């Protein structure tokens, strides 16, 4: 099996996409996930992070997008990535019935990648628990901030 070592992982919400307009729905003790996802279509791209993804791709990195979004949001996610002219090697998303914490879902995605011959070296994320997981797994992780836990 071919081993891909030049792999970079990018998160979507808060990383590739600016979600400041809808973050308010999940920052209190009573989280309103329905509204949080309902306003996803109004997200805007983060030029700085898209630029980084394009630069890494131009330098020979395989780009894989790992999102905590559910599969039911795949079409809008693909549309948002296309708007930013990003064509990842893969877009990994959680199952619609998966309610585990993001860091658990993404750790499983990482295991799947490694089992498939991909050995990511870089991750870009905004959620502290996920940033910690990437780093614990040996990846260099760029924390683009914005999320508090």
Question: What are the residue ranges of the model-derived segments?
Answer:
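Short, solvent-exposed polar/charged micro-motifs at secondary-structure junctions
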Residues: 75, 100-104, 131-133
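Amphipathic coiled-coil/heptad-repeat helices and related helical stalk/stem segments
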Residues: 48-49, 103-106, 127
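Short loop-to-alpha-helix "cap/lid" segments that border enzyme active sites
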Residues: 101-113
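Alpha-helical substrate-recognition element adjacent to the catalytic core
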Residues: 2-100
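Glycine-rich phosphate-binding loop signature in dinucleotide/nucleotide-binding domains
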Residues: 2-3, 59, 113-120
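Acidic, Mg2+-coordinating phosphoryl-transfer loop and its flanking beta/alpha structural elements
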Residues: 110, 118-149
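Surface-exposed amphipathic alpha-helices with a cationic face
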Residues: 53-57, 111-114, 135
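Short, aromatic/basic amphipathic alpha-helical patches
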Residues: 77-84, 113, 133-138
């Amino acid at each position: 099996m071919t081993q891909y070592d030049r792999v970079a992982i990018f998160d979507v919400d808060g990383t590739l996409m600016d979600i400041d307009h809808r973050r308010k729905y999940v920052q209190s003790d009573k989280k309103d996930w329905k509204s949080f996802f309902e306003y996803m279509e109004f997200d805007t791209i983060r030029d700085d992070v898209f630029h980084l993804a394009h630069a890494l791709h131009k330098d020979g990195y395989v780009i894989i997008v790992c999102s905590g979004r559910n599969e039911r949001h795949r079409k809008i996610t693909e549309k948002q990535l296309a708007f930013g002219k990003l064509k990842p090697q893969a877009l990994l998303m959680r199952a619609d019935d998966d309610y585990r914490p993001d860091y658990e879902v993404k750790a499983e995605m990482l295991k799947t990648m490694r089992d498939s011959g991909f050995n990511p070296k870089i991750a870009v994320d905004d959620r502290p628990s996920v940033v910690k997981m990437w780093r614990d797994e040996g990846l260099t992780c760029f924390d683009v901030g914005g999320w508090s836990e």
